A protein has these predicted regions:
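Active-site glycine-rich loop that binds ribose-phosphate moieties when present
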Residues: 9-10, 33, 37, 53-56, ...
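Short, conserved loop/helix-junction motifs that constitute active-site signature segments
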Residues: 43-49, 83-86
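Conformational coupling and interaction surfaces
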Residues: 73-75, 92-217
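Short, conserved beta-strand edge motifs with alternating hydrophobic and charged residues
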Residues: 54-55, 90-94
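A short secondary-structure junction signal
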Residues: 36-41, 63-68, 92-94, 101-107
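Internal, conserved structured core segments that host functional sites
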Residues: 10-41, 53
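Single conserved hydrophobic/aromatic residue that forms the stacking wall/gate
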Residues: 1-12
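Divalent metal-coordination and catalytic microenvironments
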Residues: 30, 82, 149
């Protein structure tokens, strides 16, 4: 049973605490409410989680405000909790996902697979192509969440930069901003537990996606 006031925090807590330490990677692709609640309910989960690879944030621009991305903006307090715990975090934000554009050439490869799933995926791209053009003036639609999984499958698909990251929760104009300190030399993993995704290997990424669509059939 899910207690309304705790959301899925209890579920996260039970699953992590009942698993071997270092065997669970959290891959949130939405607001971080449930993970923050789990941490508050059972702080020991932080040491048991292998890493957190999240889709959210951005160190240059936002999409829900000038500086804030939707997943962080809608619950910045929870994001602040998650980023300030001492577990390894990779932030796959808009700076990276806006490079994962479904160009007409990519969509043609998806269509060529010729399965119901590939037709469904292509239809989604048609919808998002129009939506992104109308609302954000993108020529081609970006895909966001798959970038996190691509990184986990093959780290070489996504280049990263280690740097301190925090979430603004008080600014009049900047609530929900993920503030990445990219100044100076890159710190070591021992010095800094957060890193941001910076550059996508476009061809390798779409090869992974198209291969997955073919495998699923």
């Amino acid at each position: 049973d899910v207690e309304r006031s705790r959301g899925l925090g209890d579920v996260y807590k039970r699953q992590i605490m009942s698993s071997e330490p270092g065997t669970i990677t959290l891959v949130p692709t939405g607001p971080l409410t449930n993970i923050a609640m789990a941490v508050r309910l059972e702080p020991r989960i932080v040491r048991r989680v292998k890493e957190v690879v999240l889709m959210g944030g951005g160190y240059h621009v936002g999409n829900w405000s000038a500086v804030a991305e939707f997943n962080i903006k809608v619950d910045p307090e929870s994001a602040h909790v998650v980023f300030n715990e001492d577990w390894p975090i990779t932030m796959v934000g808009l700076d990276l996902t806006h490079q994962a554009l479904c160009t007409p050439e990519v969509q043609a490869k998806i269509n060529a697979i010729g399965t119901p799933l590939s037709a469904f995926a292509s239809g989604l791209m048609d919808f998002f192509r129009k939506a992104y053009k109308d609302n954000q003036d993108f020529i081609d639609p970006p895909v966001h969440d798959p970038c996190t999984i691509a990184y986990l499958i093959d780290h070489s698909v996504v280049a990263t930069r280690r740097c301190p990251v925090d979430v603004e929760i008080k600014g009049e104009l900047t609530v929900g901003m993920t503030v990445a300190d990219l100044r100076g030399p890159e710190p070591s993993a021992e010095e800094c537990h957060t890193q941001v995704a910076t550059k996508l290997d476009f061809d390798k990424f779409w090869d992974l996606i198209i291969d997955a669509l073919k495998r699923i059939g």
